[in-house]
Amino acid sequence: MPKLKNHSGSKKRFKFTASGLVKAQAAGKRHGMSKRPQKMKRNARGTFVMFKADGEKIAENFLRVK
């Protein structure tokens, strides 16, 4: 049976912390930013650590990490 390949898009979008949690970019910053409050834009800057359950799903289904 051939090797299962990792999801290419997921490899680019998610990173792991040293403790095994998953980091991702904040969503909702592609367009229409002039209508958004400054606080919302500021909070969407940088990366955030996903909830543990969501991170486990990403790792299992897309990145093939157990």
Swiss-Prot record:
What keywords is this UniProt entry annotated with? Answer: Ribonucleoprotein, Ribosomal protein
* Key word Ribosomal protein present: yes
Any GO BP: translation
Q: Which GO terms describe its molecular function?
A: structural constituent of ribosome
**What protein is this chain from?**
Large ribosomal subunit protein bL35
Gene designation per UniProt: rpmI
GO cellular component annotations, sorted alphabetically?
ribonucleoprotein complex; ribosome
Which InterPro entries does the record cross-reference, listed alphabetically?
Answer: Ribosomal_bL35, Ribosomal_bL35-like, Ribosomal_bL35_CS, Ribosomal_bL35_sf
What organism is recorded for this protein? Rhodospirillum centenum (strain ATCC 51521 / SW)
Q: Where is this region: Disordered?
A: 25-45
Keyword rRNA-binding among UniProt keywords: no
Q: Which Pfam families match?
A: Ribosomal_L35p (PF01632)
Q: Where is the composition biased (Basic residues)?
A: 28-44
Q: Which domain of life is it from?
A: Bacteria
Q: What family is reported?
A: Belongs to the bacterial ribosomal protein bL35 family.
